[in-house]
Amino acid sequence: MLLTFGLLARHMGHEQFALNATITALTNLGVQICGLGSQESLVRRVAQDESFYPEMLGHVHILNIATGAVLILIGLVAIPVFFPISEDPMVTFAATGLILVTNIILLKIIWLATNSYIAHSNFGGANKLEMLFAALRMIAAILACTVFGITTVAEWAVWNFAAHAIAAMAAMVAISRLGRPKFTIVREEIPLGLMFASQFFFKALRGNADILVLTAVASSEVLGSYTIARRLMEASYMAVEALNRILYPGSAAAAVQGLGRVFERAKRMLFVATGIGLASALFVWLITPLLPVVFGAEYASLSWINRSLCWAVIPIAISATAFEALGASSLQKVRAKITNISSFVGAGVVALAAWLVGIDGVIASFYALEIIIAVLAWRALSRVHAETTKPQTDQAAFAGSIHAARAE
């Protein structure tokens, strides 16, 4: 992934690379809405009862197609107006269409395959699909940049679409091996899916507000450097994310036996996730001197931005353990309340900091928000656990409140 990113940054130059980052930030918002959180529902429900897979697969397909079509139409209207890719309107329209289909529809198909295998606890199959996807994108970037010498967003859109299309076809074959879908809407999962999707939409909004505002107030070099540093920090989180994905089905199954079991798993995972986050941050900090060689000397701000931002993975890893436990316990309302409010407010804080202070304000607000979210997430999980361990006379009342929270 980093090789792909490095090739694009070097060969596009900071102006086209910054434009690509801005459009990608917008599609990141769309992909969180696409499907209305149905893939999380699939993982959770199938982990608890594999016989329910056909219904959940059909549920996901219906919601992905319906919401994806709407999002693509919106993007085709908005992106060419605010972020034209080329002086030629036809090139802009065609490239925008390819980007939207790639970053929303095809990406959702690939994610569906990996999530389906995770739901069946087939982590080897999920990892193979992700490795294939990463390899295809890397091959596309190598060919596009070093052989064909692409330099624009429009040119990369074609190559990126091709890589995603091949990966999506492989994903569909992989999905077919698990069983055929039964096309139906699982109505009770719609509210939970919306809660889940809203969390990641607002999180993506907060995570991309900085890029969108920096587009207006910072140079393309600073925006490009910040985008690279953000991607490095996010890549360093992948080990923690992989651990979460492996443990999530087990946590969902444990939730059937009570929230106490999930809380104990989360406490054990907290130490592991924090350790992995610390090691990942240290690694990114140590490789900083190599970044100008990899991405190009024109990204003059990259080194100091990277070393300032890389440690943010630690509070992110800490909060993720609590959020995964809440999600596995079907307490999406509790999780969504924390995520949505903090992300909505955080998006405004980050945008204001970017507008008033620039890149320094973005980095400072990023740390402050992630630390606050980690504290709130663990406080909520601890409160839920404390209530479940109350004396027997109090548990009946609390059980009703938990049931209501899950149902809403």
Give short role names for the model-derived ranges:
Residues 1-39, 194-221, 347-351, 366, ...:
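Signature of the first transmembrane helix
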Residues 15, 81-99, 286-314:
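Interfacial segments at transmembrane-helix termini and the short loops linking adjacent helices
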Residues 22, 94-98, 127-177, 344-345, ...:
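Hydrophobic alpha-helical transmembrane segments
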Residues 23, 28, 32-80, 91, ...:
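Membrane-water interface segments that mark the loop-to-transmembrane alpha-helix transition
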Residues 45, 104-130, 311-341:
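Membrane-interface junctions at transmembrane-helix termini in multi-pass inner-membrane proteins
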Residues 61, 65, 97-101, 124-131, ...:
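Hydrophobic faces of transmembrane alpha-helices in multi-pass small-molecule transporters and flippases
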Residues 124, 149-160, 166-207, 246, ...:
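Interhelical loop/hinge segments that connect adjacent transmembrane helices in multipass membrane
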Residues 5, 34-51, 119, 229, ...:
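Helix-loop junctions and terminal segments of transmembrane helices
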